[in-house]
Amino acid sequence: MIWNDGVERPDPVNINNIIENKFNEFIESSKLIERNGLAVGSGGNLSIKVPGGILITSSGSQLSGPKLDEIIFVFYVKANDIYYCGSKKPSSETIMHWMIYENRPDIKAISHVNVGPKDEKEIITSKDEITWGTRELGEDTANTLQNTNVMMLKNHGIIAVDKNLVDATKIVVEYADNKKPYIFT
């Protein structure tokens, strides 16, 4: 289906098929997060790049086991406006995910938990604490992740990218310490 902006994206029926086809990756990643005690603090978010946009966990969904209706198709982000299909709002970190995918066309998935790093792991950390959900955080994170597949968002959590969601989540598991949750209100 060609949309008004000239970009070809899936129609609503195909969006449901895409979500159903990718749902197992979200479940497998959630199991890894849960098994390693990383579904703590204020959670985090998961996303997968798909034709015409991204699939991302909804705002308020639990990383310990998202439901099918908590996977949202985002088809466009412009400035602070997010265009999506789904019964729930996409994650507040959608802008950050979108900007990472724009900067890294080689990656297809992002895993993010609100947990600090293991002491023995060396990890690039953002210099400043930047408010979550902002374009500033998206720009800083996207720029840093041009040269690495994992980083620590200062006082926020670990984020990792890879070719699929399970592999991105394995990187998060390798670096994240479940005894260091970040809780946002």
Regions found by a protein language model. Give the residues of each.
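Glycine-rich flexible loops
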Residues: 1-185
